[in-house]
Amino acid sequence: MASKGILKNGGKPPTAPSSAAPTVVFGRRTDSGRFISYSRDDLDSEISSVDFQDYHVHIPMTPDNQPMDPAAGDEQQYVSSSLFTGGFNSVTRAHVMEKQASSARATVSACMVQGCGSKIMRNGRGADILPCECDFKICVDCFTDAVKGGGGVCPGCKEPYKHAEWEEVVSASNHDAINRALSLPHGHGHGPKMERRLSLVKQNGGAPGEFDHNRWLFETKGTYGYGNAIWPEDDGVAGHPKELMSKPWRPLTRKLRIQAAVISPYRLLVLIRLVALGLFLMWRIKHQNEDAIWLWGMSIVCELWFALSWVLDQLPKLCPINRATDLSVLKDKFETPTPSNPTGKSDLPGIDIFVSTADPEKEPVLVTANTILSILAADYPVDKLACYVSDDGGALLTFEAMAEAASFANLWVPFCRKHEIEPRNPDSYFNLKRDPFKNKVKGDFVKDRRRVKREYDEFKVRVNGLPDAIRRRSDAYHAREEIQAMNLQREKMKAGGDEQQLEPIKIPKATWMADGTHWPGTWLQASPEHARGDHAGIIQVMLKPPSPSPSSSGGDMEKRVDLSGVDTRLPMLVYVSREKRPGYDHNKKAGAMNALVRASAIMSNGPFILNLDCDHYVYNSKAFREGMCFMMDRGGDRLCYVQFPQRFEGIDPSDRYANHNTVFFDVNMRALDGLQGPVYVGTGCLFRRIALYGFDPPRSKDHTTPWSCCLPRRRRTRSQPQPQEEEEETMALRMDMDGAMNMASFPKKFGNSSFLIDSIPVAEFQGRPLADHPSVKNGRPPGALTIPRETLDASIVAEAISVVSCWYEEKTEWGTRVGWIYGSVTEDVVTGYRMHNRGWKSVYCVTHRDAFRGTAPINLTDRLHQVLRWATGSVEIFFSRNNALFASSKMKVLQRIAYLNVGIYPFTSVFLIVYCFLPALSLFSGQFIVQTLNVTFLTYLLIITITLCLLAMLEIKWSGIALEEWWRNEQFWLIGGTSAHLAAVLQGLLKVIAGIEISFTLTSKQLGDDVDDEFAELYAVKWTSLMIPPLTIIMINLVAIAVGFSRTIYSTIPQWSKLLGGVFFSFWVLAHLYPFAKGLMGRRGRTPTIVYVWSGLVAITISLLWIAIKPPSAQANSQLGGSFSFP
C-alpha cells in the first residue's frame, strides 16, 4: 500500500529492509495537475515490463490471499493480491501483497459420476470441459462409456449429448467464450473495452452501440419464453414450452388492503375529529377570557398550531396497506431450469452492499466485522453479491479487522450454509437465549458448532487485540527508524571529522503495517497527508469475485469441519477509503456513499445497491430476496428503492425512550406505502442504481397525480405542458422515444470516467424485470444474466481509485442531482425526496422475520443528541429548495404533505414549550385559559379526547403495535419536543441567518462501563444543556401545583374549577415527562450534583420572577393569615 507521502521521490518507501523498487503506475499527470488513469491498451503499449516490479506488503491470510492459486487467472490473481492507492497529488499505484506460504492446494475438479472421482476433462488451456449444458463434470473414461454404452445420454440431466465425439467436445469448449459472449447484446466498436461491456447506447453514427434485436433472436441458442419469433429446434425441446403452458403466471408480490371494518371507521373518526377541532377552535376564538386575555391569547395560538400539526400528520395515514412476497415464485422464475436457462443458473440481478463506518473508536470494528460476516453469508447467489466497506476515517485498525473477518468468513459462511443458521451474525447467533439445537437434524451439527464457536472466540481475541498490536508495532518500527537516523548522522560526522554533539532528530511517528511500511491512511498521531481530513485514496480487494460455478471442499482435517457438498465460495469484499485533502468539502456520509457508488459501478456494477450502517446486520438471510421480489415484479421498474423497517437489539424491556420507534416504522411508514412510498431512513434500503443516478422513471409521462387513494385518478395527457421548474429539477436523463439513452451530456453530470459512463446503460438493462408477461412494458429477456461477471484487472481498479479522489466531483452534478444529496445532516430524507419528486415510487417491505437489526442509544443524553441531529436536518430541509412546498407535480398531494410535515415538525417545539408552562401560569395567577369550565368547553374537550383515543386504538389494530409502545412514543414526543427540537430550531435559524455551520459527532456504540449489566448505559447520567428546558418545566409545574393548592385552601372563596383545570393540565405534562425524570435519577449515587443545583436554582428564579412581576396584594396577605411581605 502506498500514498503520496510514502512513494514520492521515485517511489521509494521509507523503510530500509531492502532496496525499494518502482511501483506499478497506472496514470499520468496532465498540465492542470490532475492524474488521468491509463487504459488497458495504454498499459500494454506505453509502460515497459521494467516498470512492473513488486512492492511487497504483508497482510493476514484471507480466502483470497492464497499463493499461486491455479484456479484464478493471472489478471484476477494480480488484482486480488494488490492494494491500490492514489489521489489528486499522487499517481495511481498498485502494490503487490506478499503471500504467506501455504500447503493448501486448489481443489481439482473431480468426476461427478458415482464411484469414479477421477480428474475431469480439460482443454489445452487448462479449462474444464463440460460436454453437456447442465455443467455435469465428467472424466474422459466416463464420457466414453456414456457415449458408447449409455446411448449418448448425459449421466446428470439424462439428456442426449449434442457432441458425441471427443474432437467435437474440445472444439465446442474452445468456442465456449464466443457462445457466452453472444448471450448478451454488445456495443460494436470502441475497442476491447466496449466489447467487454453491454451497451444500450445509440451513438450519432447509428450502427455503433445500437441494440441489435436480430442478434438476440437469431444468433443465440437460448430462448426467451413463449412468443419468440424463432423457437430453437436443437435444444432437446419440441413444441411449446410445457412448463410455461402448465404453470400460470404468478406475481412476486401481493398488496394486502387493510380490512374495511378497521379502515373505514378510522377515516370516519379522522373526519369527526377534524370537524370537532374546527368547531372547538371557533368557539375558543369567540369566547375570550377577559380576566386573563394574555393567557387566552397564548393558549389559542398554540392550539391553532397543534391543530395544523395534527392535520399534517394525520392526512398521510388515510391509506395504509400491507404487502407480502412469494419467494417460491422468485425461485421458479430466476433459478429453475427453463428453455431459456437450461442449466438453472441464477438469473437474478447483482446487488452491491455498502457498509459505512467513520471512527473505529465510536464504532467498534468487531461490530462492523460481524455485520460484514452476516452479509457474506446471506442467502443470495454468491456471484451476484459484492460488499464494499467505506472507511471514512482511513484507519489501519479497520483495514486489518476486515482482513481478519475475510479470513474467518472462510469457515463461518460454509457453516451457515450447511446448517441453515439464523441469524448469520456470529456474535448474535452464539448469544441466542433460545435452544441452538432446535430443528437441527444433521448429526455433525454439535461438533461443527463447537469448532466454529472456538474459532470465533479466537477471532474476537485477535480483533480486540489489534489496537495494541498496531500501537506496539508502530512504536517498535519508529524506534528502529530513529536509531537508523542517529547512526547515519554519526557516520556523516565521523566522515567529516566533526566531533560536535549530536542534534536531536525529529521523525514523525507513523503508523506501520505488518511488513514494515507506512500506512497510507490516517496515522495514530496525525501528520500532514496522514490525518482524518488529509490522506490518499485506498482500495483493497479483500475477497476476489467468486467463480461462476459452485465449488466445494471435502473434510478439512485441520479445522475438522466437513464441508462436503457445501458451496464454499465467498462474495467479493472490497475495502475503500476515499481520498481526503484540505480545501475539499468531504460532505460527510453522503460524500462517502457517492464515492462507493462510483467505485462499485466500475468494479461490479450491480444494478441494485443496499446500504447498511456498520451496526445493522442481516438478521434474515433471505432479506435480499424479499426486496428483489418487489424490484422484479410487474411494474417494479418504476420503484426507486425498497425500504426495510429498522429493528433494534439491546433496548431495555420498558423501552423508556421509545428507541424502537414502532409508531413511525409500523404506522407512518405503512401509511406512506399506500401513497407514493415510504421515506428513506438512512439504512436498510435497497436502491435501484439508475434512480440514484438521477434518471426519471420509465413511462414518466404517463404518471398520475391523485389527491388521495380514495379519489379517482386522472391520467395526464401528453398535450399538457410540463412546468419549467419541474424540467429543471428532474434532469433530462429520461429515455428517448426509441429506447436509447442520450449520453452526450453524461460527462458533465457524472464526470469524465468513461468506465463509469459505460456502466450506466448496463445497470439500467440488468435492473429490468423479466419480460414474462404482456403487462411488463420495460422488461429484459429471461436468461440474460446467467453469464458470469467480468474479471477484475488492474486498469479497472486503477479507474476506481480515480473516481474516489477528492477532485472528481468538481463541476459535476454529484450531490446536487446525482447520488446522495448534499447540504443536510439528514441526507437520507433529502435523497428519497428527490427521487419521489422525479416521479419514482418506493415500497415498504415488512418481512415475517426481521430483515435487519441494529443498535440504538439507550442513554438519555445520547438519545437526545440523536433526535437533535434528525430535527436539525428537518429544519435545514424546511429552509432549502427541498421544501415540499416547491415539489413538482409528479409528487402526490398526500405525499407532499408528508414531506412538508418532515420539515415543519421541529417548529412545534416552540408552541409546545409555551403550552407546557401554561398550567403553571394558570396556577400561579389563579386564572385559566377559559373564563369558566362550562358544559360546552367540557363537551368539546371530551369529544376531541375520545376521538384521539379511538384513533389510537384503530392504529394499534391495523399496525400491530402495542398500547405501551404508543404511549412511550407520546411521552418521548413531548420530551424531544421540549429539548432537542427547540435546540434544532435555534441551530437551524443560526445557519440560515448567520451562516454558522452545524457539526455533529457520531453516536457512540460502545458498551457501558459496567460490563456485567446489559443496560448499564441506561442508568448513566451525562449532563447536557438539552436537559434544561424539560427540567425547568418539571420544577415549575411542581411548584405551581403547591402554590395553587395553598391559595385555594386558604382562600375565602375557593375556585376549585380553575384549580382542577390547572392541576389536571400540570399532571398531563408531568406524566409525559416521567421517563425524563426517571432518567435523571439514574442509580443511587450516580446522579450528578449539577442536576440538583440546576433544579433548585431554576425553580427559585422562576418563582421570584413571577412574584416580582405580580406581587400578592395586601388583601391576599391578610387572607393567608400571615404578616410576612416581600421587600
Swiss-Prot record:
Region span, Disordered: 1-24
- Membrane disposition: Multi-pass membrane protein
Any idea what job this protein has?
Thought to be a Golgi-localized beta-glycan synthase that polymerize the backbones of noncellulosic polysaccharides (hemicelluloses) of plant cell wall. Required for synthesis of a cell wall polysaccharide essential for root hair elongation, but not initiation. May be the functional ortholog of Arabidopsis CSLD3/KOJAK.
Q: What class of enzyme is it?
A: transferase
Expression tissues: Specifically expressed in root hair cells.
Disulfide linkage: none
Q: What is the protein's given name?
A: Cellulose synthase-like protein D1
Gene Ontology MF annotations: cellulose synthase (UDP-forming) activity
Specify the species.
Oryza sativa subsp. japonica (Rice)
TM spans, by residue?
Answer: 262-282, 292-312, 910-930, 936-956, 982-1002, 1025-1045, 1059-1079, 1089-1109
Q: Give the residues annotated as active site.
A: D392, D828
Q: What induces it?
A: Down-regulated by 1-N-naphthylphthalamic acid (NPA), an auxin efflux inhibitor.
In the record, biological process GO terms are: cell wall organization; cellulose biosynthetic process; plant-type primary cell wall biogenesis
The enzyme's E.C. designation: 2.4.1.-
Q: Where is the signal peptide?
A: none
Say which domain of life the source belongs to.
Eukaryota
Per the similarity annotation, which family is this?
Belongs to the glycosyltransferase 2 family. Plant cellulose synthase-like D subfamily.
Its subcellular locations are:
Golgi apparatus membrane
Q: What does the entry list under GO cellular component?
A: Golgi membrane; plasma membrane
UniProt keyword annotations, A-Z: Cell wall biogenesis/degradation, Glycosyltransferase, Golgi apparatus, Membrane, Transferase, Transmembrane, Transmembrane helix
Q: Which Pfam families match?
A: Cellulose_synt, zf-RING_4
Q: What happens when the gene is disrupted?
A: Plants develop short elongated root hair with kinks and swellings along their length.
